[in-house]
């Protein structure tokens, strides 16, 4: 288990016509690594009443990419959101340490699959002039399936989004420095067709929620 890291990121909706622009020369961005394409497959869990989602907590088991395993995303902070990671284990049985971390919220309540989110991601690391990683820029092509029992079961939603996440070089310094970097990147992305996200997270969108 990791003790948890704070992720600072912004997401944007884009349509099929949008093309990711070059960000070299924006703020401190001096170079870009070759894009890395991979597939992610995540199953999200909650109580049937969505106790975790209502508390703005997300629990998933994700395969693929560079951080496969169980993840808990905690409620947003003033800046960013803390995420804990656990080993993937075998199958979809929720590990004891994940249950223990959630005990205050759900006790021994039954946790069931509520959504599956598959994502073809094309990720590019942006670096400063010293080679330090500033940002991971992700072009996500998402297919989400609602797994809840009831009339929405099996509902499939597809969309594309761009995600900007600060890496160690971009996270250093003051909050104002981080905001300035993200704002500069956002200006370039908006000019290329990026729009504010229609939902607060991939899970919310998968479930047809706005938060």
Where are these regions (language model features)?
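Phosphate-end processing signature that detects enzymes handling 5′-triphosphorylated RNA
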Residues: 1-211
């Amino acid at each position: 288990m990791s003790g948890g890291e704070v992720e600072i990121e912004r997401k944007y909706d884009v349509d099929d016509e949008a093309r990711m622009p070059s960000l070299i020369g924006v703020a401190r961005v001096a170079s870009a690594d070759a894009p890395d394409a991979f597939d992610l497959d995540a199953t999200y869990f909650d109580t049937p009443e969505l106790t975790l989602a209502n508390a703005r907590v997300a629990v998933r088991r994700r395969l693929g990419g560079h951080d496969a395993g169980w993840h808990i995303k905690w409620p947003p902070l003033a800046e960013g959101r803390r995420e804990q990671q656990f080993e993937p284990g075998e199958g979809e049985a929720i590990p004891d340490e994940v249950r223990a971390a959630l005990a205050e919220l759900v006790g021994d309540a039954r946790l069931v699959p509520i959504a599956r989110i598959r994502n073809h991601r094309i990720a590019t690391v942006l670096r400063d002039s010293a080679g330090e990683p500033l940002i991971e820029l992700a072009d996500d092509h998402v297919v989400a399936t609602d797994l809840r029992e009831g009339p929405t079961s099996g509902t499939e939603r597809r969309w594309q989004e761009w995600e900007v996440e600060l890496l160690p070089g971009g996270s250093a310094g003051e909050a104002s420095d981080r905001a300035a970097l993200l704002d500069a990147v956002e200006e370039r992305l908006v000019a290329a067709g990026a729009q504010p996200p229609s939902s607060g997270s991939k899970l919310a969108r998968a479930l047809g929620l706005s938060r």
